[in-house]
Amino acid sequence: MRFTISLITLALVVSAYGSLAQSVSGVVTSDGEPVLYANVFLQGTQIGTSTDEFGRFELKNVPSGKHQLVVTAIGYAKTVKSIDIAAGEALKIDIEVKEHAAQLEEVVVSGTMKEVSKSQSAVPVEVYSAQFFRANPTPSVFESLQNVNGVRPQLNCNVCNTGDIHINGLEGPYTMVLIDGMPIVSGLSTVYGLTGIPQALIERMEIVKGPASTLYGSEAVGGLVNIITKKAVSAPLASVDMFGTDWGELNTDVSVKFKATEKASSLLGVNYFNYQNPIDRNKDGFTDLTLQNRISVFDKIDFNRKANRPFSIAGRYVYEDRWGGDMNWTPEFRGGDEIYGESIYTNRWEMFGIYQLPIKEIVNFQFSANSHKQNSVYGNTPYNANQYIGFWQLTWNKSIGRKHDLLVGGAYRYTYYDDNTPATSSGDASVNQPAITHLPGLFVQDEISLSENNKLLLGTRYDYNSIHGNIFTPRINYKWNSKNKRNIVRIGGGNGYRVANVFTEDHAALTGARTVEFNGELLPETSWNVNVNFEKKIYTDNSTFIGLDASAFYTYFTNRILPDYETDPNKIIYSNLNGHSVSKGISLNADVSWYSGLKLLAGVTLMDVSVEENGEKFRQLLTESVQGVWSVGYTFTRIGLSIDYTGNLYGPMRLPLLGELDDRAEFSPWWSIQNIQLTKRFNDRWELYGGVKNLLNFTPPANSIARSFDPFDKNVVFDNNGQVVPTPDNPNALTFDPSYVYAPNQGIRGFIGFRYTIR
């Protein structure tokens, strides 16, 4: 009897305990739909379960107190919720998860000039979010691209640190830079116009590698970079992003959103960059980093219209004062021949917008205009230039049946360019003759859906250049994808043309270290390109995502315009290539995300860029054969701490020498720039970040600037033909030359900054 009573008592106690045991239950959804078979568990415990066919879950016997509730599922981003469960509580919680960033149907516009999901685009488009660039914060768009595979910011001068953007080994003039689809950064601004775009206003960057001339015109031969700015409606109310380095650099981005009118929202952004601390670590007597004082103001107004028809107007103003040179240089020596300095004043404004006509058909009018004024001296050589560009474009998008999606457009571009060089003077050099170019054009594109998994894109463009006449640029693209869109093959081909302007594209032509010579009239370059792209997405059983993107490319040039630095050390000779040039290679990008939160982005490009002239083949100058990039990130969710490790690696490049006696290396070494950053997130508003740039402290050799101690060649002896004569004081027959440059002279440095955002 006592035994029976004891059993009953024990059962009652156990039952009472069970009724008081804590539990957590709920439903996991995404966009209102249940997520089946998701993993739901308490971090740091063995308590876990999976959702059923209705997305439901229940965790039993949960210890009371605070926990991290983790949800993972194939194709979805890891989600962590903080819970606090009291003794005896049966907690109910519904969890919304988001698709994995690599799984999301990103909307792109650069490939076909209209909004489509990335997986549906017949043209391969790479998309890089603002978060990607935050892993290695930089003060300019130019520097931010250093961790994009196949893209390299190339410095062109050791003194003023100007640069351009190379894609797949092709120089900057072959890359078109757009802002919201408009050709803003071009011509004169390709040298100094890539700075001052406020990073806080950038939504994403889209990169197309290969010709896009059919839709965007002549400069998109090598590829394009399209900077997509945020829409006012989706931007935060206000944000501040400020960081500085122990070299004395200070960069500030400020943005604010406000209602301009009842139906218009405005997004105002200001970028300010200041560096006024001359440093000469390599002891060559010259500044390692150009001193800069720059301010940029950007404003974008979005109008709310019926049927969500787009209407926006944006503008930007940039002023910059930069100089580099002898450490003893001051503004009083500007333009003289006592102490060498390169001083550049830039005044630039831009305006662009889009308006969809209020009619039944989808007809968009786009426009842009910009003015670029440069007042500069390179030693005692002045270079003053004015450029005005006006552009408008009208496009009509029409679907015909279920298979044809037509895009028809007309465009006109006006370019005015004037400077103080022989490029804009009459034949006798006594009368100024600005260069004015009219470029009307028509283009048509048909995207044909052959089947659910096959798509064909046909396009052609006709331009009439007021100087060079008729120009045709056709293109063809084909895309196949598997039913689940996890395997995609794209094949594309097309041609392009380009009219070169030496003084707006090649900084070496301005330095005064060499005279410029033209060998005959420069004809437009033409190119033919073929590329193949394969994209694969893999989802493993342990919620790991692997994205692979492989490409092969081949571009064949005729009439290519290349600067000849080697025939005469005192000249840069420009002429059309008497032969051909080839750029070919392969690339691979990998995007791997583990359920633990670790993320890896890595890529490698192997390429061969060569020139063949008069039966002789040689490598193109300043072009690497191997490039690697990586970005590794991990977030410690519980403490709100993230770590990012980024870097790049470049193979040897052939460098420009001044002659056979030049003792500088003919090829650059293997070199790498690596960075690390820690970010502490305090709440939804505050972030503190800091780290180290150029961890390996890599810099080029100290003798990169030839004869930096004699920049005006006052102690150089020349013969009657203008050739340098070796002397005891100049045994290598050198002249002053700052164009031997392949990497920044700025070594290791620390940085710290903060972000404050009001949403």
Question: Would you name each region that the model predicts?
Answer:
Residues 186-188, 201-203, 214-226, 230-281, ...:
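Outer-membrane beta-barrel translocator/receptor signature
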Residues 362-376, 481-483, 490, 523-576, ...:
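Membrane-embedded beta-barrel scaffold of Gram-negative outer-membrane proteins
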Residues 29-33, 37-43, 72-76, 86, ...:
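Short, acidic, small-residue-rich periplasmic hinge/interaction motif at the N-terminus
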Residues 275-296, 302-363, 369-388:
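Flexible loop and strand-edge segments within Gram-negative outer membrane beta-barrel domains
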Residues 91-96, 141-144, 163-166, 178, ...:
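N-terminal periplasmic accessory domains that precede
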Residues 600, 649-657, 680-759:
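C-terminal beta-signal and adjacent terminal beta-strands/loops
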Residues 58-61, 166, 182-209, 297, ...:
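Short acidic/polar hinge/loop motifs at secondary-structure boundaries
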Residues 449-453, 547-548, 553-556, 576-658:
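Gram-negative outer-membrane beta-barrel transporters
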